[in-house]
Amino acid sequence: MSRQWDALVIGAGPAGLRAASVIAESGLEVVLVDEQAFPGGQIYRHVTAPGAEERFAEAADYRDGTELVRRFRRSGAEYLPETTVWFLEQDRILASRGEEVLDLRARNVIIAVGAMERPVPFRGWTLPGVMNAGAGDILLKTAGLLPETPVVLAGSGPLLYLVASHLIRKGHPLAAVLDQTPPSNMLKAAPHLPAGLLGLPLLLRGLSMLNDVRKSGTPVYRDVSGIEAQGADRLERVSFFCKGTVHTLDAATLLYHGG
């Protein structure tokens, strides 16, 4: 396959879908390339797949994601799902789709692959039952799978509380949230609050996630360090240091997010 477009977009998440839609609506020829079978990226993962509405923990995410995909499909942009780009040089892009190699040409390329959750090693991190928090959320969205209890979430950053909120809204109990964010980060962030108010909907969503955890009664340990996954053949316990004391919690699943 060899053809030239005005623009080629890599990544079918929110940014890639919007970019491809706007370009196509402007009358230009654009193709969107993505590794997944369905558009939506991570936040709207498989949002148009059968049964997605039941799997999504937040109705607003499902609504926003489906509308974004509908706009993209109405735009007339071309779409190459299950396609992996592995070479990019000037106006030439090589990609694989199944056993086929695609030779794609475009005058402009937009890379919208989003962020990638990084695995952070800690003691016991290779035990069965330990996984990235984002991976746990993907299993929920794509297959409706909930982690084995007791479930402990640990790490730092917004994704930690987003995953906690999703599990709580699905009625899935959490043993604890272990927040490793240093207290000093709150002071460092304070000067940016006025600018942050420009993104008020996102701030309100963050407060909603925190409120979900609070209302559920899930214990939250803050300024945590020294997290260790323990067990013989699989995860059995999580130990950590908090406020001068070593704590140990029974756990069958540890969802960790290190940024």
Task: Cite the ranges covered by each PLM segment.
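A Rossmann-like FAD-binding core segment of flavoenzymes
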Residues: 72-88, 93, 170-259
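Generic domain-boundary/flexible-linker signal
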Residues: 41, 90, 120-121, 141, ...
